[in-house]
Amino acid sequence: MRILLIRHGDPDYENDSLTEKGRREAHMLASRLINERIDYIYTSTMGRAMETAKPTLEAKGMKAEPLDWLREFSAKRIRRPDYNGELAPVCWDWLPEDWTVRPVLYDKDNWFKDDIMAEPDMGSYEKMVHEGLDTLLAGHGYEREGMYYHTDKANDDTIALFCHFGLGCVILSHLLGIAPLPLMQGFAAAPTSVTTIYTEERREGIASFRVACYGDTTHLYVNNETPSFSARFCEMYSNKEERHD
């Protein structure tokens, strides 16, 4: 099995839609995916993800199944120190000096229990994503068994998930068995980037997942479109024109 994890295009967060740049990116993505074999497409129920998927669906003559658990992983009551007493809207974009000193945030089973996190249902929210993903994979022949997957219906189907950066990190953390926060803090998936994940079945019936390519944006480069800076911060503090907070 192959999973294509696709982030939405350049976002207009206020209106949960795409910017003009994001719409261009979505059409460039479609021109790439038209030549890819994709068997099933699933989308977040948020506007920016569905708008990103639309050109691909039209180009391929396919329909997508919307899934609520693919919505952005937005825990909105996080007590990040840089918010000076206010509650942060997301559980990523931490300053390194605030999160790296808290070992529990590296723990895949307990990261959401840290007392700096005020979201009361964080664990339940993560569980909902895990269960949604495992139910989807079971429907495609791969049943979760501990930290790997059992299959008696192995296949080379390709499924595409049009979703979000934070949610994508939670998906990867579950498939790879690591905490999501180091992924959220250490990786940047540009808008319309494609992350490719394959199953590996080295022994019959026992499968795991491996990331073959993360955050690919070649469809933008071949069209002379610079990837959006979204999900990144300034390379140097002195770069005043780049995002600092």
Question: Residue ranges of each PLM-predicted region?
Answer:
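Active-site metal-binding loops of divalent metal-dependent hydrolases
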Residues: G9, F165, G215-T217
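Acidic, low-complexity terminal tails and accessory targeting/binding regions
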Residues: F73-D93, M147-T158, V170-D245
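Short glycine-rich phosphate-binding loop at a beta-alpha junction
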Residues: D39-T45, Y148, T158-L161
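Short catalytic helix/loop segments, enriched in acidic residues and glycine
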Residues: L18-L33
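Phosphate-coordination/substrate-recognition cap region in phosphate-metabolizing enzymes
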Residues: S31-F112
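Extreme N-terminal starter segment of soluble prokaryotic enzymes
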Residues: M1-L4
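Internal catalytic-core helix/loop-beta-alpha segment
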Residues: D114-Y148
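Conserved beta-strand termini and adjacent loop/short-helix elements that scaffold enzyme active sites
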Residues: I6, L67-W69, A212-Y214
